[in-house]
């Protein structure tokens, strides 16, 4: 899709954002169907799939045997089965792991390459959707889905919509080019997810953290009532014995730097720097600002100052 008003490298804060369409090239859609699809997902994912309603999506995780998170995803009913939106960098590995335990199950698991993922946000986003699509989701019905399109509603950090579109709807968006102020790449949506507190797990940080360490309990992305699933024993033990030492934070700094995902985060105490956590995601925002998502030890004080190992820029926790 090519639009003339294209500012792919300009990422803006959510406040006072004009109508913006973001190409979500860093995410993909995985489809699972077959008579055993629900049972298989129930045995693998952290939420209770049996309680997932048709008109909603849920954040959840897929963990390894030791309770460490392979990936996080938004899952929902889709066509004759289920679909989930996941970071593209980890998708192939996660699918392979999910298929490993499906040998004796009647399921099909694959990435869909005939759909298009976009994020719509900013001024009058809801109005734009209502003009072009008959039904749109809201706080009472967070997902609208039919054979051609699916739309997810998000409230944080601003009202926004994730569009799962067919080629037909993609062409419709192209015809509405003049109504869209900005077309950004997926970094705009990534900024929103960071600000909303959704953990970003890419290939570099897969199998590194328990769900508790990336706030998935607080986000209601883990069920303790559904029974067994991979990693459940460790996750439950850490939860009930209060053994988790980490939490998810948003930090901000002036200037632009380019550290690697998984880099070490350091905290200054007195005159020394101490290793305190790890970098999950980074976005460069307009007006010379860098926003990062990090997993940090919960012993920190929010007034502390931080830096990324081998970089001088000072980061502060953003409330």
From Swiss-Prot:
Chain sites annotated for binding folate: 27, 189
GO BP of this protein: iron-sulfur cluster assembly; RNA modification; tRNA processing
InterPro entries: GcvT/YgfZ_C, tRNA-modifying_YgfZ, YgfZ/GcvT, YgfZ/GcvT_CS, YgfZ_barrel
Annotated Pfam families: YgfZ_barrel
Location of this chain's protein in the cell: Cytoplasm
Principal location listed in the UniProt entry: cytoplasm
GO cellular component, one term: cytoplasm
Gene3D superfamilies in the record: 2.40.30.160, 3.30.70.1630, Aminomethyltransferase beta-barrel domains
Function: Folate-binding protein involved in regulating the level of ATP-DnaA and in the modification of some tRNAs. It is probably a key factor in regulatory networks that act via tRNA modification, such as initiation of chromosomal replication.
Alphabetical list of NCBIfam families matching this protein: PRK09559.1, ygfZ_signature
Family: Belongs to the tRNA-modifying YgfZ family.
Name of the protein in its database record: tRNA-modifying protein YgfZ
């Amino acid at each position: 899709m090519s639009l003339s008003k294209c500012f792919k490298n300009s990422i803006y804060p959510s406040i006072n954002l004009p109508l913006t369409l973001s190409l979500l090239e860093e995410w993909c859609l995985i489809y699972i169907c077959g008579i055993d699809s629900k049972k298989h997902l129930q045995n693998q994912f952290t939420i209770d799939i049996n309680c997932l309603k048709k008109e909603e999506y849920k954040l959840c995780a897929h963990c390894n045997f030791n309770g460490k998170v392979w990936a996080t995803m938004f899952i929902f009913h889709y066509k004759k089965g289920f679909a989930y939106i996941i970071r593209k960098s980890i998708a192939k590995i996660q699918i392979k792991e999910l298929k490993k335990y499906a040998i004796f199950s009647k399921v099909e698991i694959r990435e869909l390459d005939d759909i298009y993922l976009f994020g719509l946000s900013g001024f009058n986003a809801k109005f734009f959707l209502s003009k072009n699509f008959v039904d749109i989701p809201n706080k009472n019905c967070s997902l609208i889905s039919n054979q051609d399109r699916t739309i997810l509603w998000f409230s944080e950090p601003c009202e926004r919509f994730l569009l799962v579109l067919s080629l037909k709807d993609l062409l419709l968006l192209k015809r509405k080019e003049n109504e869209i102020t900005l077309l950004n790449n997926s970094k705009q949506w990534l900024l929103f997810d960071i600000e909303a507190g959704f953990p970003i797990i890419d290939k570099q940080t897969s199998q590194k953290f328990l769900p508790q360490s990336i706030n998935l309990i607080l986000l209601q992305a883990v069920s303790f009532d559904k029974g067994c699933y991979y990693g459940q024993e460790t996750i439950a033990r850490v939860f009930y014995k209060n053994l988790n030492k980490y939490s998810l934070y948003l930090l901000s700094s002036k200037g632009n730097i380019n550290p690697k995902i998984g880099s070490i985060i350091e905290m200054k105490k007195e005159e020394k720097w101490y290793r305190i956590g790890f970098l999950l995601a980074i976005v460069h925002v307009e007006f010379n600002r860098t926003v990062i998502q990090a997993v940090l030890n919960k012993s920190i004080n929010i007034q502390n100052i931080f830096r990324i190992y081998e970089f001088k820029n000072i980061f502060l926790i953003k409330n």
